[in-house]
UniProtKB/Swiss-Prot annotation:
Extra remark beyond the main annotation: Kluyveromyces marxianus proteins are shorter in length and have a more ordered secondary structure than their S.cerevisiae counterparts, which might contribute to the superior thermotolerance and solubility. K.marxianus could be therefore useful as a new model organism for further elucidation of the molecular details of autophagy.
Disruption phenotype: Still forms preautophagosomal structures (PAS) in proximity to the vacuolar membrane.
Free-text note regarding domains: Forms a homotrimer with a solvated central pore, which is connected laterally to the cytosol through the cavity within each protomer. Acts as a lipid scramblase that uses its central pore to function: the central pore opens laterally to accommodate lipid headgroups, thereby enabling lipid flipping and redistribution of lipids added to the outer leaflet of ATG9-containing vesicles, thereby enabling growth into autophagosomes.
Membrane-inserted regions that do not cross the membrane: 509-529, 698-718
Organism encoding this protein: Kluyveromyces marxianus (strain DMKU3-1042 / BCC 29191 / NBRC 104275) (Yeast)
Protein name stated in the entry: Autophagy-related protein 9
Length: 906
């Protein structure tokens, strides 16, 4: 990176602490061990523009990372140009990524004052949190920040109807866009969603000052209002983090003297000196998932004890028991071999055991350091966020993010610097992007079908993704694409490095294949023993559970949305399993049922015969050997298990055949419906295709076992052929976002940007325009909506709906007055023209399942991201939300307005 030679007076070093608490002296700087994070001098707007335009002073694009490879440092490529706006990479002949900042345009007709808002405008990006390793944008941007009633970027008067029904009082500046702006392989062309994302009428807008504060929680946007005015979701009315007054004293504390600080001061010092925000936020989220300090420690100890037990019991049972004397012995001492570890274990096994003991020692040492790190995170939660460990199992993640946002604002206010106040900001979108920086790329990787996991073998041409193969893929690809700090290497953005990176990736695949060959015997043994101990008792006591199903690894990646955190996805996935079982059970398999009935009859007959004979001589007949070393008791257990398995697999109950309706309800949870499924929901082919995603657990265990053997061959022969596509994928799917660094372009929700080519009046009219022949409901059109736009909708809804502010294991509670309405209606039925919803107790699939599980309200257990929350679709005279629905809050309110308007015309 080239520094500006014209700048004689070098400004102070740009550290995270200086951004948060103001510029400090060199004496303090050296004492607090502040890390240098940028070699770029901070210029004003004129100097910055001159600096960028000067061809002799081009500088590399900076992100949160530094290159960790020697090949990047010695690269002869021309540096990538950086603009202070959002960066998009496009391939050009010379291999240099050219940047295209978003342009701003006025309304065509000028009927509404200001400009059409842009979801992530240049002003929004300029006011984002300053990323580590990057200089701030021009100071003029912060000086032009509006105040008072005009607070917020110009033109942010109209909000998206999706986010109108708010939880925390936040509104999105998201405006309408037409199909011209929603183009590309991942952008939908749904008419319904064109209307949903159309511009809202001017009469539905609110105070812009309030909107700026609200939107700052979800997306990076400056706020001039007091952050203390932000409301937190009930029942956790957390107090905003306090403004700390002793920060100047803490800045003079040396890193080696942290032991002299109190826990609160230590937590504040750690927060002020964060060097890698991605790692820090990941630790905060892991602490939230683990439910606190002691729960995480106990979980780590239990995992370590599980490994020890599996190795100990397998070694002991294999070398310390004399099985030849079992039949003639009556006590354990008679079959136990004394000093078996010295006399029975071979030297090779002893070496392996000592290696295992060394591994356990390293895990214990790692646990010691984990305890120290967890203690710091605990202090951060308790003293800075005001959240105790007792609240973590039930507190919503949205509340934690809100406290993080407020804490960042309080630190900026403490610095008393205009630039820091305006630009050092966090948001829910930033937090999710940083935590899921790698996961978002993995989601896009599988969604684009980049990887070829087949083998040139007739029986394995469609090899499925397994956990062991997934672990190897992450190790080879993500471990190569991201440096040790967790950021994408800039070499992946240069087309000239494509061939070199592809060859290096092939070498990693081949090396990983050899390592899997070496470790496969141990992995197979451990896998068999672990699952045997885990599932044997379950299958023995309840043999019918052998027919239980679970989602495959590839299904989990395809179902997961961009920026959807793990606990949100897990809740949605588990809630969908009940509906998935109901859907599959509606397709009777007559042929299999006939065969299983015969096997059940035969096995039951043998059990009956042996049981009757046992009555005559119970003492001796149970030990009677029917075959060599196989007694009556053995065969009774065997045939009894076979009978139970067949009985559980045969569905003898009468079920209502409504696969199409059930699958639509299932799709509302999985958010997955290929276009090939349209119009075929009731067919056996779609059911079989879904069963590949929701397979039998016993089948998945067998596939995992076989995968340990086949993984080396996939790494040798299949994945190296995709190396070029993988490198191209990272270059084409990576964007640079100021304040975040290099991220997956689909995770930035660029498809939600407004179309400035249409004025507000035209977009508002398109939202309410619908032909009488448009019989498809919004639920039906969800099928054709692209994943990125769908991820945006559910992300906004997850963080804005009050009913979604729940703990990790909590469901939506029943609402007063919501009983007695059918919940199995499609959107078309619910909003049918000229019809009213009947007050009756419907018995659709959802309601029947909830009644079976003891739930009076069918909405309980329906996560559905509440974007299509069914409880909000019904006009309830007994609830207090009637007025808000009439005002048109949210997507449902807009649809209600449209149909009400249509009925009035009639």
């Amino acid at each position: 990176m080239v520094d500006n030679q014209d700048n004689v007076n070098e400004p102070p070093k740009n550290t995270f602490l200086s951004r948060v608490f103001g510029v400090h002296s060199s004496a303090v700087e050296n004492s607090i061990d502040g890390a240098e994070m940028s070699h770029i001098s901070i210029h004003n707007s004129q100097e910055f523009n001159h600096f960028v335009e000067n061809e002799h002073h081009e500088r590399l694009i900076e992100s949160d990372q530094e290159s960790s490879t020697n090949e990047e440092e010695s690269n002869d490529e021309e540096p990538l140009i950086k603009q202070p706006q959002s960066i998009r990479f496009q391939e050009v002949p010379n291999g240099i990524a050219i940047t295209h900042p978003f342009s701003e345009s006025e309304d065509d007709e000028g009927e509404i004052e200001g400009r059409d808002p842009e979801f992530f405008s240049d002003q929004d990006l300029g006011s984002s949190i300053s990323k580590h390793g990057q200089g701030s944008s021009s100071e003029d941007e912060s000086e032009q920040a509006p105040t008072g009633d005009d607070a917020g970027p110009i033109g942010f008067e109209r909000n998206s109807p999706i986010v109108e029904n708010t939880r925390l009082g936040f509104h999105s500046p998201y405006d309408a866009n037409s199909k011209a702006n929603l183009k590309g392989p991942y952008l939908g062309h749904s008419k319904v969603f064109d209307r949903i994302f159309a511009n809202k009428p001017a009469g539905m807008s609110r105070n812009r000052r309030h909107d700026d504060l609200e939107e700052s929680f979800l997306f990076r946007k400056p706020s001039v209002a007091d952050p203390r005015s932000t409301k937190t979701p009930a029942p956790f009315n957390l107090k905003p983090p306090p403004i700390f007054q002793n920060v100047p004293n803490l800045t003079s504390v040396n890193k080696n003297s942290l032991s002299t600080l109190s826990p609160k001061e230590r937590a504040l010092w750690k927060w002020a000196n964060v060097e890698n925000l991605d790692t820090f936020l990941q630790q905060v989220y892991d602490y939230f998932l683990g439910n606190g300090f002691y729960c995480i420690i106990v979980d780590k100890v239990v995992q370590l004890a599980t490994i020890l037990f599996v190795v100990f019991i397998s070694t002991y049972m294999g070398h310390c028991i004399d099985y030849s004397r079992l039949s003639s012995s009556h006590s354990f001492k008679e079959v136990h071999i004394e000093q078996c570890y010295k006399t029975q274990i071979s030297p090779t096994a002893k070496v392996l055991l000592w290696i295992f003991y060394a591994f356990i020692g390293l895990k214990i040492l790692q646990l010691y350091f984990d305890v120290k790190a967890l203690k710091d995170v605990q202090n951060f939660y308790n003293y800075l966020l005001g959240i105790s460990d007792k609240d973590l199992p039930t507190i919503p993640w949205q509340s934690v993010v809100q406290q993080l946002v407020l804490l960042k604002d309080q630190n900026a206010i403490t610095a008393n610097a205009t630039e820091v106040k305006a630009k050092n900001r966090l948001s829910a979108h930033d937090v999710a992007n940083r935590i899921m920086r790698k996961e978002n790329f993995v989601i896009a990787l599988y969604d684009n079908n980049i990887l070829d996991l087949s083998l040139p073998i007739p029986l394995f041409r469609t090899c499925a993704l397994t956990k062991s193969l997934e672990w190897n893929i992450n190790l080879c690809i993500l471990g190569f694409a991201f440096n040790e700090r967790g950021y994408l290497k800039q070499a992946f953005l240069r087309e000239s490095q494509r061939e070199y990176l592809s060859e290096e990736l092939k070498k990693r695949f081949v090396l990983a294949g050899f390592l899997n060959i070496i470790l496969s015997p141990f992995l197979v043994t451990y896998f068999i023993l672990l699952n045997f101990f885990r599932y044997f008792n379950e299958y023995k006591t309840t043999p019918g559970s052998i027919g239980s199903r679970q989602y495959t690894p590839i299904a989990e990646w395809r179902f997961r949305e961009y920026n959807e955190l793990y606990h949100i996805f897990e809740k949605r996935k588990k809630l969908s399993m009940v509906i998935a079982d109901d859907y599959i059970s509606q397709f009777p398999n007559t042929l299999m049922s006939s065969l299983l009935s015969f096997v059940q009859f035969v096995s039951g007959s043998f059990v009956a015969i042996l049981g009757i004979l046992t009555v005559f001589d119970p003492d001796n007949f149970l030990n009677f050997e029917i075959t060599s070393d196989r007694t009556v008791l053995f065969y009774m257990t065997l045939f009894g298990s076979i009978w139970a398995i067949c009985h559980g697999a045969i569905n003898e109950e009468y079920t209502a055949f409504s696969p199409e309706e059930t699958l639509r309800e299932l799709i509302s949870f999985t958010h997955y419906s290929p276009k090939s499924w349209e119009g075929k929901y009731h067919t056996e082919d779609i059911k079989e295709e879904f069963c590949k995603l929701y397979n039998l657990r016993i089948i998945l265990l067998l596939k995992e076992l076989v995968s340990i053997i086949l993984t080396p061959f996939i790494l040798w022969f299949s994945l190296p052929k995709n190396s070029d596509r993988i490198i191209d994928f990272f270059r084409e799917c990576t964007v640079y976002e100021e304040g975040l660094g290099y991220v997956c372009k689909y995770a930035m929700f660029d498809g939600a940007k407004v179309n400035k080519g249409l004025n507000a009046k035209t977009q508002a009219s398109k939202m309410f325009s619908q032909t009488d022949n448009d019989d498809e409901s919004d639920s039906d059109n969800d099928i054709g909506v692209n994943k990125m736009l769908q991820s945006y909708m559910y992300f906004v809804d997850d963080y804005k709906k009050a009913e979604n502010a729940l703990g990790k294991n909590q469901l939506i509670s029943p609402k007063e007055g919501s009983f007695g309405y059918p919940r199995d209606y499609s959107w078309k039925t619910q909003f049918a023209l000229g019809k009213k919803i009947n007050k009756r107790s419907g018995e659709g699939p959802s309601q029947r399942r909830n009644l079976e599980h003891g739930s009076a309200n069918p909405d309980v257990g329906s996560l559905n991201a509440s974007f299509i929350n069914k409880s909000s679709l019904y006009k309830d005279d007994f609830t207090e939300n009637t007025d808000e629905m009439k005002k048109g809050n949210g997507v449902m309110g807009l649809l209600n307005q449209y149909y009400k308007k249509y009925d009035n015309k009639r």
